[in-house]
């Protein structure tokens, strides 16, 4: 509109003074160019850059405007759990062995923390007095395919994060997973399967000389497979009351949003091999691990922001 009015004024003055149309057009273009400050393009660029920088600090970098329009119409967000909402660093926080419940401090794959009973730390040098607890932690080391290594100033894992969490818990109790594996050389194994819901390893042992079959998997399965329970350093008969109590502990831990695993064992003849028939009967129950995957701090804020914007957040997980 301003350009049209400016052109009309130039044309009117030009006609009154008898200028040629081409001359009047040149005057109009010159007036239009002179009306725009020389620094305006730079000012616009700086303003846009500052705006983008401010949006970037809020994690809102836009490349396609339709994406923003779609987000503005969103009412529900469905998100994966492991590695998205959580850190993908499984951490053992509870242990149940020998009829006692233990708390494990620390987070992630850094083996810094302690095991507590009734709020009091269980010293690593006194771990032998807690035979069932030690046996549970050792079983988590040998019936395990993960690796925990200290490289370049940080702890790294190789393998499944759930199995790595068992190694971290053992180290917090002063148990070295690699030393236990050397003492109990693996002779045979049963890989984990979703049908069986457990995995097992047959390991050589110093005492007794017969190999030991360690089984690790779903608590309901292992409780059903067990006929005895390790308590006070002795394998005692597993009564129906004991079974119900173990199932209640499993339900209690699961109710705290913990992933629960169980371990059991049995001693086999020297010539025996690991097979499902042997792994599913006459086991000695050791105990339970309760573990969680800590949430990402930024995920907590993102979910709060989404809820504040009226967006429902639904977690989709394989658990």
Where are the model-predicted features located?
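Conserved cytosolic headpiece of P-type ATPases
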Residues: 1-318
């Amino acid at each position: 509109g301003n350009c049209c009015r400016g052109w009309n004024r130039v044309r009117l003055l030009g006609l009154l003074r008898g200028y040629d149309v081409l001359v009047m057009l040149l005057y109009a273009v010159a007036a239009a160019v002179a009306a725009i400050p020389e620094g305006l393009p730079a000012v616009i660029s700086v303003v846009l850059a500052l705006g983008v920088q401010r949006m970037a600090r809020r994690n809102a970098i836009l490349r396609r405007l339709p994406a923003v329009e779609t987000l503005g119409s969103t009412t529900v967000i469905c998100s994966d759990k492991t590695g998205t909402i959580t850190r993908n660093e499984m951490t053992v926080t509870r242990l149940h062995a020998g009829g006692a419940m233990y708390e494990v401090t620390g987070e992630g794959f850094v083996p810094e923390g302690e095991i507590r009973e009734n709020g009091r730390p269980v010293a690593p040098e006194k771990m032998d007095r807690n035979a069932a607890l030690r046996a549970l932690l050792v079983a988590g080391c040998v019936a395990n395919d993960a690796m925990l290594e200290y490289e370049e100033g940080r702890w790294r894992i190789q393998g499944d994060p759930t199995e790595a969490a068992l190694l971290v818990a053992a180290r917090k109790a002063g148990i070295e997973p690699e030393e236990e594996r050397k003492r109990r050389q693996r002779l045979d194994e049963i890989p984990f399967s979703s049908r069986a819901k457990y995995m097992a390893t047959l390991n050589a042992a110093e005492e007794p000389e017969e190999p030991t079959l360690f089984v690790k998997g779903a608590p309901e399965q292992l409780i059903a497979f067990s006929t005895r329970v390790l308590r006070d350093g002795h394998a005692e008969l597993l009564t129906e009351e004991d079974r119900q109590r173990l199932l209640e502990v499993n339900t209690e831990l699961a109710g705290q949003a913990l992933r629960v695993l169980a371990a059991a064992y049995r001693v086999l003849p020297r010539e025996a091999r690991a097979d499902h028939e042997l792994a599913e009967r006459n086991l000695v129950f050791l105990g339970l691990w309760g573990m969680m995957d800590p949430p990402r701090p930024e995920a907590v804020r993102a979910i709060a922001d989404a809820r504040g914007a009226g967006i429902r957040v639904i977690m989709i997980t394989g658990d």
